């Protein structure tokens, strides 16, 4: 029952994220990412079905993988367009569809894909056929190729672009570890299978991606802004990553941040000195109590009557 609850929760999280990206942000460059999140959500929901009693385990085990068969193509398309700022070539789309996606869908309900499946000790077990292994290998290759593309793009980018790439690469690696470990490695080693953890792990991966994609990209946050919002845990993480991956941009952003602070303090001090009846010490105290002089315009003290 715990597995079902976790899978359904993962499904809801992915679906919400996917629908938000597609229907709220409506940015074409993130369309593949949004569709990928929705497929993760459907995958997680379908993964829960075989755990219910009196279900056709072999049928649902084959069915639950269907949303993920096209996922490698979407991943490659998204990473390529994200890094190089241009659409994935039509020829590349056709090759992946003809060589990978269509053959697997064609044999997805045959013994060449999954031969048998059963629930034992609250875990889903199945016997994989040659096309299932082909499916997993293709997924792993798409992840590896995406990481290579990110590395190439990382070298050419600066500032928060590098921070974004770190989040996306971390999410992809987490995806690789989750799927590779819980759907492939444990099975080949003959160890107890916990393959229901794979979609849960992928949910964490998309959450990591969303920090770099939604939290930064969709709101176009600059290096300076993450310094100004350093009380946020995500902003703290962004600052640490930026400091490591691009020290030059970090120093420039820090310089601009300090310059802005000094300018605001001087402006606030001057305004209070002219428009209020406070002494110098009272102005210092007031600025100190208001976050180092960052006073919203409407909170200025009026001159005493």
Task: Give residue ranges: language-model regions.
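Individual alpha-helical transmembrane segments in multi-pass integral membrane proteins
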Residues: 1-14, 26-108, 133-140, 194-203
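Alpha-helical transmembrane segments
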Residues: 17-20, 77, 147-149, 208-216
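Alpha-helical transmembrane segments of multi-pass integral membrane proteins
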Residues: 19-46, 130-185
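Juxtamembrane "helix-exit" motif on the non-cytosolic side of transmembrane helices
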Residues: 46-56, 108-122, 180-190
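Juxtamembrane/interfacial segments around transmembrane helices
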Residues: 57-64, 86-94, 117-125, 145-153, ...
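Membrane-proximal helix-loop-helix units in multi-pass membrane proteins
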Residues: 102-144
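Interfacial "cap-and-anchor" motif at the non-cytosolic start of specific transmembrane alpha-helices
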Residues: 160-239
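Membrane-proximal linker segments that couple transmembrane helices to downstream signaling/catalytic modules
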Residues: 214-305
């Amino acid at each position: 029952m715990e597995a079902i609850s976790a899978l359904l929760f993962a499904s809801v999280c992915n679906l919400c994220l996917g629908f938000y990206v597609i229907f709220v942000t409506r940015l074409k460059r993130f369309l593949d990412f949004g569709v990928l999140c929705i497929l993760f959500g459907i995958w997680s929901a379908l993964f829960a079905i075989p755990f219910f009693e009196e279900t056709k385990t072999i049928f649902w085990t084959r069915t639950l993988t269907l949303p993920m068969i096209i996922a490698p193509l979407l991943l490659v398309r998204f990473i390529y367009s994200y890094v190089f700022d241009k659409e994935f070539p039509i020829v590349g789309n056709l090759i992946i569809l003809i060589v990978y996606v269509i053959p697997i869908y064609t044999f997805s309900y045959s013994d060449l894909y999954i031969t048998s499946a059963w629930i034992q000790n609250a875990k889903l077990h199945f016997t994989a056929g040659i096309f299932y292994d082909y499916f997993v290998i293709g997924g792993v290759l798409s992840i590896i190729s995406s990481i290579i593309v990110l590395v190439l793009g990382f070298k050419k980018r600066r500032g928060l672009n590098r921070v974004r790439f770190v989040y996306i690469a971390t999410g992809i690696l987490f995806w690789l570890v989750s799927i590779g470990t819980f759907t492939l490695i444990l099975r080949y080693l003959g160890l107890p299978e916990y393959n229901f953890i794979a979609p849960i792990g992928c949910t964490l991966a998309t959450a990591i991606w969303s920090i770099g994609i939604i939290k930064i990209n969709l709101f176009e946050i600059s290096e300076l802004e993450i310094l100004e919002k350093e009380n946020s845990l995500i902003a703290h993480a962004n600052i640490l990553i930026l400091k490591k991956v691009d020290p030059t941009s970090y120093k420039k952003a820090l310089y601009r941040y300090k310059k802005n602070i000094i300018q605001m303090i001087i402006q606030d001090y001057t305004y209070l000195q002219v428009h209020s009846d406070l002494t110098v010490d009272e102005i210092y105290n007031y600025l100190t109590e208001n976050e180092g002089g960052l006073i919203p315009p409407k909170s200025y003290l009026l001159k005493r009557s």
